[in-house]
């Protein structure tokens, strides 16, 4: 594995996965614009190394933004190699050890596992070559990105935020964006469900300042580990040690009693004072593709800034998918499937989180279906498990369905009995979900397709020779009538508060429509299928916006919702775009 971020950059360049940008490019908008275009190119394009940023540090972006680079960052040729290794490891570790010989055979496994645990070492690390303390600190030295026009300022977008539980001493490494407020303070955007926020609450109860250390760079496996859905109280650097097959070497921060990887590129040390009033942070063009709007978060005070002699500043750009984070999510699919089978649902055969679902809005699972109601069991279990609790729409198929095939899923969706297969619930949603009227809580919907015959006959959809506006709708699109029985509708330009899709279909003579989804034409009229799916998943709360009509048509209101209208969210953000 890699001894530094520069080591990884050398490997990227050797494999033709890196483009150097020698021209001067500003961290304010320009780096993000170039990176966004590259990330949306075929296969994720290339990693980008901006060598002239107007600061003393180069910036690398899109460094894990393809299947090949994501695998390379984790030290394998293909992500399935890690999944296979985890499956074999768990199988060996959990096999009952009845005899003495069985126990002796397990000793090599125990010896290997012991080599993954992080090691604390004395002295300073490479990350502490250059040191600025207290008044010497100037965060404006760092090429933090301002990505989108309405962003509240410049942000650290790949921070590994180290906190320690004041009661147990257990370390956590999370990834929470940080808005630069001035030379020595930032915001700390940890959501209420995150471990950092739980630690903050514990320090507040104890009446103590909370030490926080943020690192950037180093072996790219650290960055991945900080994003991974690890169980509470399990060290992210244990996962990193497993992935890189050797321990992470940790040194003590200079002004905080927290240990950090010695080979990182930057270290930002400081504290959060829970007795202080929270401050306004945001807006920020987020991974959902929308702005997350201004809200109150803690202020982070910086006491020291250190960096390597040859430091490279890592950054990511998030926005309308696909972006780099889609490939990070794909790695998580592969790596955590075996633990999901073990700890949550052994009948789960495969898991897919389509890029359009931005990790939380949409997931597809296949299961080994053996009894009635099993899909209900799986849905409720997944909605209560780790970060899957944020999932909003879930599709469940039988084990033989290739869930990444649009054709296979379309055949099931076209033929399923919607009156029988819908599983409705409500629960925790991502704080960034803007469609629900209550922040962090809303509707959930699963479709049980496990008993649907993909070869069953289907009735034709009857379309009108011409249609007229009705129910607040004026246009329709039939591109997916054949494969899905889906009619795409566009609301009137006046953006009425309510639309009546059932009235539009009835008055214009549509018959046999399985699904009808309405969008704002200005927002969605020229969108590709993937973007329409992204918009529909993001803009809807299943409780309010998904209705099964009396004649069996599933209608979905995917328009932007007008704040203040009964049942709508109090604020509705814009799409993050240049």
Where are these regions (language model features)?
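Extended, highly charged
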Residues: 1-283, 287-578
């Amino acid at each position: 594995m890699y001894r530094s971020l520069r080591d990884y950059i050398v490997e990227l360049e050797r494999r033709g996965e890196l483009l150097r940008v020698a021209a001067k490019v500003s961290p304010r908008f320009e780096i993000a614009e170039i990176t966004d275009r590259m990330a949306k190119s075929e296969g994720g394009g290339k990693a980008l190394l901006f060598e002239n940023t107007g600061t003393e540090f180069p910036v690398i972006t899109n460094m894990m933004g393809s299947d090949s680079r994501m695998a390379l960052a984790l030290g394998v040729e293909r992500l399935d190699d890690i999944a296979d290794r985890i499956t074999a490891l768990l199988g060996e570790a959990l096999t009952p050890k009845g005899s003495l010989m069985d126990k002796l055979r397990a000793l090599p496994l125990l010896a290997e596992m012991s080599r993954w645990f992080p090691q604390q070492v004395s002295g300073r690390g490479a990350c502490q070559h250059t040191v600025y303390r207290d008044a010497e600190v100037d965060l404006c030295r760092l090429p933090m990105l301002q990505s989108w026009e309405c962003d509240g300022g410049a942000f650290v977008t790949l921070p590994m935020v180290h906190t320690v539980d004041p009661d147990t001493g257990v370390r956590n490494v999370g990834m929470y964006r940080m808005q630069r407020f001035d030379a020595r303070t930032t915001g700390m955007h940890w959501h209420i469900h995150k471990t950092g926020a739980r630690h903050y609450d514990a320090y507040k109860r104890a009446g103590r300042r909370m030490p926080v250390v943020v690192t950037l760079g180093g072996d790219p496996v650290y960055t991945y580990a900080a994003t991974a859905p690890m169980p509470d109280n399990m060290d992210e650097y244990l996962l990193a040690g497993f992935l890189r097959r050797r321990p992470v070497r940790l040194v003590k921060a200079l002004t905080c009693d927290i240990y950090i990887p010695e080979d990182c590129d930057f270290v930002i040390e400081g504290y959060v004072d829970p007795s202080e009033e929270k401050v306004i942070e945001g807006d920020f063009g987020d991974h959902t593709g929308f702005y997350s709007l201004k809200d109150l978060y803690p202020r982070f005070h910086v006491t020291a800034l250190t960096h390597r002699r040859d430091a490279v500043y890592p950054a990511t750009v998030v926005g309308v998918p696909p972006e780099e984070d889609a490939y990070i999510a794909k790695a998580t699919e592969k790596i955590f499937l075996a633990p999901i089978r073990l700890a949550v649902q052994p009948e789960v055969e495969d898991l897919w989180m389509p890029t359009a679902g931005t990790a939380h809005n949409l997931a597809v699972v296949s299961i080994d279906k053996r009894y009635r109601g099993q899909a209900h069991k799986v849905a409720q279990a997944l909605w209560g498990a780790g970060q899957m609790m944020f999932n909003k729409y879930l599709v469940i198929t039988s084990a033989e369905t290739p869930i990444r095939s649009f054709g296979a899923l379309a055949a099931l969706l076209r033929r399923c009995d919607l009156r029988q297969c819908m599983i409705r619930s409500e629960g925790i949603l991502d704080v960034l979900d803007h469609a629900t009227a209550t922040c962090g809580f809303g509707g959930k919907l699963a479709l049980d397709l496990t008993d649907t015959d993909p070869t069953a006959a289907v009735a034709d959809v009857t379309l009108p020779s011409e249609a007229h506006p009705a129910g607040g709708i004026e246009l329709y699109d039939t591109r997916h009538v054949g494969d899905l029985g889906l009619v795409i509708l566009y609301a009137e330009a006046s953006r009425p508060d309510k639309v009546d899709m059932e009235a539009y279909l009835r008055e214009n003579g549509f018959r046999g429509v399985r699904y009808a989804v309405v969008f704002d034409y200005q927002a969605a009229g020229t969108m590709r299928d993937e973007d329409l799916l992204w918009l529909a998943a993001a803009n809807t709360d299943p409780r309010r916006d998904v209705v099964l009509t009396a004649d069996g048509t599933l209608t979905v209101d995917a328009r932007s919702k007008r704040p203040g209208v009964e049942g709508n969210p109090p604020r509705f953000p814009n799409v993050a775009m240049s």
